[in-house]
Amino acid sequence: MIIDTTEVQAINSFSILESLKEVYGIIWMLIPIFTLVLGITIGVLVIVWLEREISAGIQQRIGPEYAGPLGILQALADGTKLLFKENLLPSRGDTRLFSIGPSIAVISILLSYLVIPFSYHLVLADLSIGVFLWIAISSIAPVGLLMSGYGSNNKYSFLGGLRAAAQSISYEIPLTLCVLSISLLSNSSSTVDIVEAQSKYGFWGWNLWRQPIGFLVFLISSLAECERLPFDLPEAEEELVAGYQTEYSGIKFGLFYVASYLNLLVSSLFVTVLYLGGWNLSIPYIFVPEVFEITKRGRVFGTIIGIFITLAKTYLFLFIPIATRWTLPRLRMDQLLNLGWKFLLPISLGNLLLTTCSQLISL
């Protein structure tokens, strides 16, 4: 039997070509993910620097100034220091829960970025249930905190984990009801559709004006979800040393630190998407994609402009949670639970009822 070498070479080259296509496909699939992770990392470093500078301004003192120009590398220096610190394990604790807890907290928050549109259709997962997927994923983080508190075998850590779980449950429900009201107004649960529904009238089309009560409830609930003052009871220094973080050191403590700022950034991004018009300009009847959709370069430029607008709104909004840290006193645990269950929950239910009635009347 004679084998044609030309056919063999053609088959081999075809198989090599197919395998190269698969490799390129995997690479192109990973590039957006790595780009998003890099962008999120830079975003967190910027938030840390902003918080230190704004806090210094509020307290009339000098902020970080030695690590890089204007102290912009101070957060990077702190992170590097944590990387090289010793990783201690509690002698009588549950080491598996102790080690898994920080990872669950960080991963659940990172997954929330999948449904955030940074510009026109610049989103990793444009799902029809995008906002509710974010709520479902973010509710996993307190499980990691509770595991960390329990695995530490420390009464302060365990109390901090219990507080984190109770606080998350109390404020998750009003937050969900506010998101449901926005979903009813936009006739969609997709984050992209919600932004596009606010694009027609520019600044006046923002859901902030159509849902002022919902915006205030969402703001308070998101601050509680991020455990920012006045809702930082899970890690109250005067009561619980450092809460569920008490026994942690090194990179694991750094993961909690990163998770806190990741959660703050994702909450601010969702405020921008749900209430502040997302990537759109604040000029009536001017929709960013339609302005730059003429050429390929125009599309790229429009995408960059959309990213810039989204981030500008997000970082401007971040001034509110940073300022409240040095303005409002910490609540007691009973006050926190009463605020969530007896005040915010009825208000968010009433807001949802009003939104539903207005939508039914407009049919």
Curated annotation (Swiss-Prot):
The keyword Translocase applies. The chain crosses the membrane at residues 30-50, 104-124, 127-147, 248-268, 300-320, 343-363. One of its GO terms (biological process) is photosynthesis, light reaction. It is found in: Plastid, Chloroplast thylakoid membrane. It is a multi-pass membrane protein. GO terms for cellular component: chloroplast thylakoid membrane. Keywords: Chloroplast, Membrane, NAD, NADP, Plastid, Plastoquinone, Quinone, Thylakoid, Translocase, Transmembrane, Transmembrane helix. InterPro entries: NADH_UbQ_OxRdtase_su1/FPO, NADH_UbQ_OxRdtase_su1_CS. GO terms for molecular function: oxidoreductase activity, acting on NAD(P)H, quinone or similar compound as acceptor; quinone binding. Signal peptide: none annotated. The keyword Chloroplast applies. It is an enzyme of class 7 (translocase). It catalyses: a plastoquinone + NADH + (n+1) H(+)(in) = a plastoquinol + NAD(+) + n H(+)(out); a plastoquinone + NADPH + (n+1) H(+)(in) = a plastoquinol + NADP(+) + n H(+)(out). Its EC number is 7.1.1.-. Its main location: plastid. HAMAP family: NDH1_NuoH. NDH is composed of at least 16 different subunits, 5 of which are encoded in the nucleus. NDH shuttles electrons from NAD(P)H:plastoquinone, via FMN and iron-sulfur (Fe-S) centers, to quinones in the photosynthetic chain and possibly in a chloroplast respiratory chain. The immediate electron acceptor for the enzyme in this species is believed to be plastoquinone. Couples the redox reaction to proton translocation, and thus conserves the redox energy in a proton gradient. Belongs to the complex I subunit 1 family. This is NAD(P)H-quinone oxidoreductase subunit 1, chloroplastic. The lineage of its organism: Eukaryota, Viridiplantae, Streptophyta, Embryophyta, Tracheophyta. The gene is ndhA.
